[in-house]
């Protein structure tokens, strides 16, 4: 929106009063950093041979399909990306689903492991040997998960951490009520109730997520000199 408005003013001043072009120009200069951070326009270029490609994906149970097949769009996408390391969240599969996924991608990823306590369903697919799995324990009971793996890449050892942290957990009904509240179509009393409910959910989720982050950080501090890759669905956007 900032770019569009600023560009519009730039065109306007070019046509009607050229000397004022400096105003939107300064806007572009001052806003370059934030815009570049949130809208990273990258020029395609060839990658070095030593480049490592990583994919992190919350599959949502591979689309919540009752029966996963080779044609599953998420499986096909993962295969097409051909990443060196794949970290998946909510990747719980039946035994049949595991066989289907292995048939489709097992040749690409000879090293695989999972962490399936609760409903988190963390999975790692790797082209590098897995040396060791390190579960990360959260203090509060939860269905969320975090797990780490040590991989051997050439002569180096690297730590890969895969997380699925606490979400706010807003229901579809609450989302609809919140939209009405924002639009101003919800009654005053209902708006007050919904705002309190939302604040409570935000506070509760953030408190739980903070504890989970501490557990992940505690593990990372145990490997200060190890190359580390941190992936996951952090539910904090």
Show the residue positions of the predicted features:
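Alpha-helix initiation/capping motif
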Residues: 1, 15-17, 61, 93, ...
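Transmembrane alpha-helices and immediately adjacent membrane-cytoplasm interface residues
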Residues: 2-45
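Generic detector of short, locally flexible boundary/turn motifs and exposed helical patches
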Residues: 18-22, 51-54, 88-93, 111-117, ...
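Structured beta-strand-rich core segments of catalytic domains in phosphoester-bond hydrolases
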Residues: 29-49, 66-67, 75-79, 84-181
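Short amphipathic alpha-helical segments, especially helix-boundary/capping motifs
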Residues: 49-52, 74-78, 189-194
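Active-site beta-strand/loop signature of hydrolases that rely on acidic residues for catalysis
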Residues: 53-59, 74-98, 159-164, 201-202, ...
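Acidic/histidine-rich helix-loop elements
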Residues: 56-71, 169-205
